[in-house]
Amino acid sequence: MSLIFLRFAFASIFLLPFFMSQKKKIKLAKKDLPKLIAVGVFAITLNISLFFEGLKRTTAIDASMLSLTLPMFSVLFGWWFLKEKIYFVNLAGIFLGFLGALVIIGIPQIFTGTISREAFFGNILIILASIAWVIGAIIAKPLLSKYSSLVVTGIIFVVGAITMSLPSAVEYFNNPAWMNQITILGLFGLTYMILLSSISAYFLFEWGLSKTSVIVADLFQYIEPFVATVLAVLILGERISHSFLFGAVLIAIGVFMGTLAKKEIHHRSRFHKH
């Protein structure tokens, strides 16, 4: 929790000069403030907290592949809340992806007793982290037509830092010596998380979201789990099980069908939210 706090606290500080230079141009409507706070709570506080807590309990391979369900949640939530179009093939893909997620989460292994409760709970937390991210993106979408991507990014960083300050303080008082254990390599890692993983990544996502739909914006994140899986095997020495491969194939096909369907092929199978 302390790492999350430091990450977004320093990211907020880095963005402070921009806000100071643009403060006369930035006019926030009072009615939008609760929405911006909600984006920060869902997209940062809940998303990252749930993901890291889940990662403590499960493998990096399972966590990375389960995060691939994010585009499928984007399809459902984008259709339901933003009235984005959805087709029959999308629903079929979501169903396949859901089955794949159940396999990786460990539903079959529960009945055979080959998965621990801790790992199962960790996998559930990873799924909840994806849902939290999509909810944040759904709330942010209409706000990006009013405010610049950098403004939205800066505000949610501040929200993330504030909401993580209390658990970070508790963690520090329980183990005040942890800061003395930070190495030079650790400082480089924190700098990377602040400048690239936080400021650059969140800004580019919010900017991309302002130019396209929630579905398309989240679609590009499906490359990440496959890269993470390869690194987990090479660096962490984790093993890929047969059930993981089966679930991963189902999710990959599900994401493809759920998000990459061509309008001209499926125009007769269109669904609309009433």
State what each model feature region is.
Residues L3, R7, G54, W80-L82, ...:
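Hydrophobic/aromatic residues within transmembrane alpha-helices
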Residues M20-S67, V103, I194-T212:
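Specific transmembrane alpha-helical segments of multi-pass solute transporters/efflux pumps
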Residues K263-H274:
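Intrinsic disorder in cytosolic terminal tails and internal cytosolic loops
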Residues L15, I37, I86-Q109, S130, ...:
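Hydrophobic transmembrane alpha-helices of multi-pass small-molecule transport proteins
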Residues M1-S2, P34, I61, Y87, ...:
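Residues that define the loop-to-transmembrane-helix transition and helix capping
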Residues M1-P17, A38, A92-V103, F120-L125, ...:
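Hydrophobic alpha-helical transmembrane segments of multi-pass integral membrane proteins
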Residues G40-T45, S49, P71-L76, I131-V134, ...:
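Hydrophobic/small/kink-forming positions within alpha-helical transmembrane segments
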Residues A9-F14, L66-W80, F95, V159-T163, ...:
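Alpha-helical transmembrane segments of compact multi-pass small-molecule transporters, enriched
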